[in-house]
Amino acid sequence: MRALAAAPLCALLAACASGAAEPRFTVVTVDPAHQRLQLFLNDEQGRPYRRLEKLAQALAKHDRKLVFAMNAGMYHADFSPVGLYIADGVALSPLNLAHGKGNFFLRPNGVFLLTDAGARVIESSELPALHDKIHLATQSGPMLLSHGVINPVFDPGSRSVHLRNGVCAVDGKAVFVISEDPVTFHAFARYLRDALKCRDALYLDGSVSSLYSPALGRNDHRAELGPIIGVVAD
């Protein structure tokens, strides 16, 4: 494992690559109690950022630094979110409980959210019963893990491999994971369960999966992106 060497955030933002057998993963842990975790979609002109680097440049104009960023859920051709999107407490896209084709609609899908209690991942169907004030939320799918159980739709023998990224929550902290090698859904979920001790984990996307982290020397650009999640420092 290698630790993030970005003082003064080294004690708060931990990143590592698994150094054992393939496949490899990079893990970034964010503590919302000490770090500013935000969702981003459009710039000041209402245009989608599309690239992690463009978001970093826009923040820099206001003397703010993008410490970490990752694609944060699935999106339409116009880059708008497929499902729930809440930024700064304001819902810009509603919860999507429809049936359809594609990974987003594989059951169950879920929501990553941030409340005063910290980060959480829940199944989408559970959201209407949640009464906590939500500061940010992004809906995606499918759930990789629910209550410690790998999604039963995943085939351990599948040959469908892609770069993938996802998120879980451990003790109120957000744990973001991106694979450095193409992996199956099952292998990805198993890593989050066994190596990271996640109980509920959400798939964010595959193939387009991208990471921004100056401390790790990362500025990925695999595709144009919709929702982006990141840590911002002044």
Language-model segment annotations:
Residues 80-149, 154:
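Active-site-adjacent helix-turn-beta-strand microarchitecture at beta-sheet edges
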